[in-house]
Amino acid sequence: MNGMNSIHLQQTLPQVFADRNSVTSDVWHQDLIFRKGEMYLIEAASGTGKSSLCSYIYGYRNDYQGIINFDETNIKAYSVKQWVDLRKHSLSMLFQDLRIFTELTALENVQLKNNLTGYKKKKEVLAYFEQLGIADKINVKVGKLSFGQQQR
């Protein structure tokens, strides 16, 4: 599977919102395209579907109306193998509960995923730690880091 270049939401709406008379949103019931290499901020009140959107895009849930395409393919048509390949090479998600191993160092936690994908060289990984302002924490066990440091 080649790298994904765009995520296209077409009139997408969580099923839980379907029975509401009106949903005012910059995301739901819109035609949106998120393009590779661009940065986007989705900011909204609690309970408006931010986590749901991430779960749909990551393939964890499909309880929505409308269409979500990766490039030109409807994601509801993806097989388990295709989802695995996407998550290895094109998608990554920072979960709210972090899903890290507190007994491993920050670098070891990052290397776990990177060893599966072979996506970044160690030099590149170390550069990210530097950019995030936590280069001095690479050999610290994650359980000893602040929550903000763990998120980075």
PLM region spans:
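ABC-type ATPase nucleotide-binding domains, specifically the catalytic core motifs of the NBD
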Residues: 108-123, 131
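A short, flexible loop at the N-terminus of ABC-type nucleotide-binding domains that lies
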Residues: 1-33
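Conserved ABC ATPase "signature" region
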Residues: 74, 122-137
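Conserved ABC transporter NBD signature motif
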Residues: 66-75
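ABC ATPase NBD coupling module
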Residues: 75-92
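Helix-to-loop junction immediately C-terminal to a conserved catalytic motif
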Residues: 58
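Conserved ABC ATPase signature
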Residues: 141-150
